[in-house]
Amino acid sequence: MPESRARQRLAEEAARIILEEGVRDYGLAKRKAADHLGMSGRREMPANTEVEAAVLERNRLFAGAENRREYLDRLRVAAVVMERLAGLEPRLVGPLVIGILEPQPLINLHGFAETVEEVIFQLGDMGIQCRSGERHYRGGQGARAPFLSFRGPEGLDIELTVFPADGIRQAPPSPIDGRPMRRLGLPAVQELIAEAEADLAPSD
């Protein structure tokens, strides 16, 4: 099989695994794809950007109306949570930003505060119980950042990674291509909602 075709098949299978099995680690998805296709001995794997392109293409081809409605619902919940946490200047990150609906009912946000403790107190004042953890990023500022997970509206899980107040100026590197992660403020999320609503509107 030509090298280019082998890379394409691996990227496509990794994309299927990401979308259907909810695997978030692109490296793991590629290794599983290689095992599924009998290519586990390969040294050359498709780049993460190739896999992401395959994810977007598969989503474009196979996302039905039900999937698009669920995507819209998840964006609406994200907007509600962002409005409630406006003091943290929250930003939406992750697959929803590029139009991808994960199997897990999860919304990823970045928030900004002097300390994570003040965020925990704020959530407590709102009657929200949360669990804490730590997220690791590749190098640079914010290589480690605490995150809080809690249940949001409609039973969706929220993961809020808390950065220092000045961390809003520099996004951490994306695990896909190493560039600064895309972050969307509430106005941009509302634009996505409007686009998703238009996509679902019946045509004349």
Task: Give the label of every model feature segment.
Residues 4-23, 30-103, 114-204:
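Catalytic core of pol beta-like nucleotidyltransferases
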Residues 106, 110-112:
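Mid-length scaffold segments of soluble, non-membrane domains
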